[in-house]
């Protein structure tokens, strides 16, 4: 008997993340285990707005956007670990350490994000993340996010 995967489609992703086009950088969550790991994807197409200027002749996805997408995957894992989305709080990208880039990302690539929760204490979570294309490492980093109440 096969194991049931925990997935998220774009509608569910949008119920957790405040980002919208062109800054919503996660297309689908393939699997997650609350408090442990999350595996998500982003399909990179030539239609991405950043390719207009980075770089028109040789399009390359900016590294900061790869890190932002990793942070969004981290936020999804944080929300799923807390078991609820709340209109009264957000997870903010609070820090990054040990970021390394190993390969460029071009139109047609599919990014695979694997984020792991290391610890959480008083609303601050520490995670590790890797991004791969076709099994080849693109980027790795340690990410911190902080849960904050928001006023309306």
From Swiss-Prot:
It comes from Shewanella woodyi (strain ATCC 51908 / MS32). It holds the Pfam family FabA. Its EC number is 4.2.1.59. One of its GO terms (biological process) is fatty acid biosynthetic process. Keywords: Cytoplasm, Lipid A biosynthesis, Lipid biosynthesis, Lipid metabolism, Lyase. Involved in unsaturated fatty acids biosynthesis. Catalyzes the dehydration of short chain beta-hydroxyacyl-ACPs and long chain saturated and unsaturated beta-hydroxyacyl-ACPs. It is found in: Cytoplasm. The gene is fabZ. GO terms for cellular component: cytoplasm; membrane. This is 3-hydroxyacyl-[acyl-carrier-protein] dehydratase FabZ. Belongs to the thioester dehydratase family. FabZ subfamily.
